Design a protein with these regions (language model features):
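A short, amphipathic alpha-helical segment
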Residues: 2, 53, 149-152
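Bacterial N-terminal signal peptides
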Residues: 15-23
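N-terminal signal peptide c-region/cleavage motif recognized by signal peptidases
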Residues: 25-27
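Histidine-centered active-site/metal-ligand motif
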Residues: 29-31, 148
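Extracytoplasmic c-type cytochrome modules immediately beyond a signal peptide or single-pass transmembrane anchor
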Residues: 32-138
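The canonical Cys-X-X-Cys-His
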Residues: 139-152
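Short Cys/His-rich "knuckle" micro-motifs
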Residues: 155
Length: 155
C-alpha cells in the first residue's frame, strides 16, 4: 500500500510538472515584451521588402537560383509573422498595424499564409514564365499591396 501511495505521488508530481511546462510554453509570446514583438515583426516586414526588391532584380536578370532561395526565405518569414500579432501588441512602439488585423484575425492570417504559399509557388513558376516581372507582380507584390492597403497605416 505504501508503494502505491509513493507511486501516485510520483505520478501527480510528473502530471503537475507537465501541465506547468505546457502552460509556460504556450505563454511564450505573451511573456515576451510588446516592444520586442513589434520590433521583430517590423524588422521581418522590412527584411521581406528588401528581399522582394532583390528577388525582382535577380529574376529579371535571369539569376533564378539565387532568387528562388530568397523566395523561400520570404515564405518562411511570412510563417513567422503569423505568430507575431498577439492581442497585447495592438498598439505602441510606433506600430503601423491597423486594429482590423485583430478584429478579423482569420482574414489577416489567411493573407499571410497566402503570401507564404505564393512565394513557394513563385519558385516553381519563375523560370518557365514568359513574363517574370508580371508573375512577380501578381504573386509577390500583389500580396504586399493587399496587406498595406488593408492592414497598415498610410504614410
Amino acid at each position: 500500500m505504501h508503494s502505491l501511495i509513493n507511486h501516485n505521488e510520483k505520478n501527480i508530481g510528473i502530471f503537475l510538472f507537465l501541465i506547468f511546462s505546457i502552460l509556460i510554453c504556450s505563454n511564450a509570446h505573451s511573456d515576451q515584451s510588446v516592444e520586442s514583438i513589434i520590433m521583430v515583426r517590423k524588422a521581418l516586414f522590412s527584411q521581406n521588402y528588401k528581399t522582394a526588391k532583390r528577388v525582382q532584380s535577380l529574376s529579371v536578370s535571369g539569376n533564378f537560383d539565387e532568387a528562388k532561395n530568397l523566395m523561400i526565405e520570404m515564405s518562411k518569414n511570412y510563417q513567422v509573422l503569423l505568430e507575431l500579432f498577439p492581442d497585447n501588441s495592438k498598439e505602441g512602439f510606433k506600430t503601423r498595424s491597423l486594429p482590423i488585423i485583430w478584429e478579423d484575425k482569420k482574414l489577416f492570417n489567411a493573407l499571410m499564409q497566402k503570401s507564404s504559399d505564393d512565394m513557394i509557388k513563385l519558385t516553381s513558376l519563375i523560370e518557365s514564365t514568359d513574363d517574370p516581372k508580371g508573375t512577380i507582380g501578381k504573386l509577390m507584390w500583389g500580396n504586399c499591396k493587399a496587406c498595406h492597403s488593408k492592414y497598415r497605416v498610410e504614410n
